[in-house]
């Protein structure tokens, strides 16, 4: 059985909506492949940050057992939220022992503006994954692909979404997030099959 983690921070739940859509995509792909896929979805909470440091050793142990980790954060001031950065900094022991090496990684972000430098957040998430020796998965859809207009912003590195005034996501952003979940789950399945032979 494969295990895919979705680790994110969300203040207004816009990024949380993306996380749930990604989880739905992972689940749909698992059903399609008639294989079981465990999903570990963890929203970073303020109570886990003590004197500026993220503290949750149990989560770090669980992440070491995952086949893929999908990272998410809203874009604040052109980068990840401080809460996510606290989590990233706390992963240094996992980095030192390369516990996440060769795992699949992907990322997602949201912002209040059409382009509030969300690509900088994705680039940070990519660099973070590369530091851990992970394999980054982006989107393989050009902008406005298919009936659902997947990847409406044309960002290949991961999911970028803009929350509406009502706090809801555009339908194509939800569909794109589901697609990324399916894509990561399919790749994990292929890699598992390859390593089993």
Residue ranges of each PLM-predicted region?
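Short, glycine-/small-residue-rich phosphate/pyrophosphate-handling segment
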Residues: 104-151
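Glycine-rich phosphate-binding loop at the start of an alpha helix
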Residues: 123, 155, 171
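Glycine-rich, flexible loop/turn motifs
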Residues: 96, 135, 146-165
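Short connector loops at secondary-structure junctions
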Residues: 40-47, 141-151, 155
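Short, surface-exposed, charged loop/turn segments at secondary-structure junctions
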Residues: 86-88, 125, 153-154
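N-terminal beta1-alpha1-beta2 submodule of the flavodoxin-like/Rossmannoid cofactor-binding fold
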Residues: 1-99, 159-197
